[in-house]
Design a protein with these regions (language model features):
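Active-site neighborhoods and metal-handling regions in enzymes and metal-associated proteins
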Residues: 1-257
Length: 257
């Protein structure tokens, strides 16, 4: 069942979202050659506590960390470790969520490590733009599939592929709620979006094949062909005034990331 949130609940989710925004922005400023993904995870966990929040991922279905840090061909759910250090030219996706006062916020950003190849810049840009286009469709009266169709159309127009095995989701008092928010499909299908719905919209886009596989750790998903992937995400509320990005401050406008 899709649960619509009250204005008060959405305000609480915005407070959780601001914690996510602030932590992710601190982490992406830390990204540099030689930094380990465990270094980033430790900061993510510490900052949640300083804000009176709880890291949403740690312990969720047994996940062992507060942050997902996925490098290059790793699509999502990369487990931080001391031995996994960033190198010049890498892409790293930072996916982070918190629970604050009983409500969740969730966002992700892909960050270049130093200078990256131009085709990786393009992959990041197209993925980020696909999120912008998806968020624009998160309006009352539209169909749920309009969101994913916007992602797929933009991504495939630029010669990249959309991951099917992992999708966005509803979010609220639980990290994952109904509905599933696909990043593909035909427009005009699924439930109509209503005021109070809150969606975690998160395109995952591969340079090569859309196919992925999960490593033996049971978490890290990688592209089947070893080519790089990018991932951007925001938590978005459907309101009377249009989409409201809850995982950034009210006074920030323009592109989602």
């Amino acid at each position: 069942m899709i649960v619509c949130k009250s204005s008060a609940e959405i305000e609480t989710m915005h407070r959780a979202g601001i914690v996510v925004w602030e932590v992710l922005n601190e982490l992406r400023m830390m990204v540099a050659p030689g930094v380990s993904t465990l270094d980033l995870d430790r900061i993510a966990e510490r900052r949640a506590a300083e804000h009176g929040a709880r890291p949403a991922f740690k312990g969720y279905r047994g996940y062992p960390a507060s942050l997902c840090a996925s490098i290059n061909e790793e699509v999502v759910h990369g487990i931080p470790s001391a031995g996994r250090k960033l190198n010049e030219g890498d892409l790293v996706s930072l996916d982070y969520g918190v629970e604050l006062d009983g409500y969740f916020g969730d966002a992700a950003v892909t960050v270049p490590v130093g200078k990256v190849r131009s085709e990786l810049d393009t992959l990041m840009r197209v993925t980020r733009e696909s999120l912008d286009r998806a968020i624009e469709k998160a309006r009352a009266g539209n169909r749920l599939s309009d969101v994913g169709a916007a992602v797929q159309e933009w991504v495939e127009r630029h010669g990249f592929s959309v991951v099917r095995e992992f999708v966005g989701h509803g979010i609220g008092t639980r990290m994952h709620e109904e509905p599933s928010v696909l990043n593909y499909g035909q427009p005009g299908h699924g439930p109509r979006l209503q005021e109070g719905m809150v969606l975690a919209i998160e395109p995952m886009v591969n340079q090569g094949t859309a196919n992925v596989r999960v490593l033996e750790d049971g978490w890290t998903a990688v592209t089947a062909d070893g080519k790089p992937s990018a991932h951007f995400e925001h938590t978005v509320a459907v309101t009377a005034n249009g989409p409201w990005i809850l995982t950034r401050p009210r006074d920030v406008s323009g592109p989602a990331w």
